[in-house]
From Swiss-Prot:
Entry-linked Gene3D superfamilies: NAD(P)-binding Rossmann-like Domain
Gene this protein is translated from: HSD17B8
Record flagged with keyword Lipid metabolism: yes
GO biological process: estrogen biosynthetic process; fatty acid biosynthetic process; protein heterotetramerization
Name assigned to this protein: (3R)-3-hydroxyacyl-CoA dehydrogenase
One cellular component term from this protein's GO annotations in UniProt: mitochondrial matrix
Molecular function (Gene Ontology), one example: estradiol 17-beta-dehydrogenase [NAD(P)+] activity
The species this protein was found in: Sus scrofa
Catalytic activity: a (3R)-3-hydroxyacyl-CoA + NAD(+) = a 3-oxoacyl-CoA + NADH + H(+); 17beta-estradiol + NAD(+) = estrone + NADH + H(+); testosterone + NAD(+) = androst-4-ene-3,17-dione + NADH + H(+); 17beta-hydroxy-5alpha-androstan-3-one + NAD(+) = 5alpha-androstan-3,17-dione + NADH + H(+)
Family: Belongs to the short-chain dehydrogenases/reductases (SDR) family.
Amino acid sequence: MASQLRLRSALALVTGAGSGIGRAVSVRLAAEGAAVAACDLDGAAAQETVQLLGGPGSEKGAPSGPMAAFQADVSEAETARRLLEQVQAYFFRPPSVVVSCAGITRDEFLLRMSEDDWDKVIAVNLKGIFLVTQAAAQALVSSGCPGSIINISSIIGKVGNMGQTNYAASKAGVIGLTQAVARELGRYRIRCNSVLPGFIKTPMAQKVPQKVLDKVVGMIPMGHLGGPPDVADVVAFLASEDSGYITGASVEVTGGLFM
């Protein structure tokens, strides 16, 4: 999808921006003209993304608005609240686009999964999105600004997967959370949608054995794994006014897997 500068007046906060889908989303939104606040648990990785965008520390000029990196653990309430405060202090406004990409896996079969691995995945993947969405919504409502909140779920949240009861539950929760938020915030001109990637070539997918990936590819009608830019293109659409009458939707980016 070619850039159309649909977001030239937007400020986008992207969590999980240090790699994979989060980095691709940051690049895509910047190409659309948005200023980008790139957040990651790994602050150095977030800074690398900002440099890639042409922000502070880069030898090239920023292609659009100002860019900045932020370090935060989105699973902690105080940290999530402080993140929004820091972003507003830096850019002098709340983010009008919020994309929650931060996520982890701790895979194990149900019979052997530890409570700690369950709690960690739920804390980042579901609680983290709740906290960031809540803080961003509070900032937008207080300022009277419209916005678009986009939560990265997963097709696994819809169909489940062996060895991923924690991950599947967290991503299913994101879908339900997104729909509830869409109902609550529509009156404030704030939209909320989720994106359900399939198997995407990311650092997380690199942990999957090749023979498993080969089997998955054989199940995909498009015949190949997706790339982070495929997800980022959909996010850019949902962030823009081209999707102005879309809220509460769950958009699958799977190449036809599990349809």
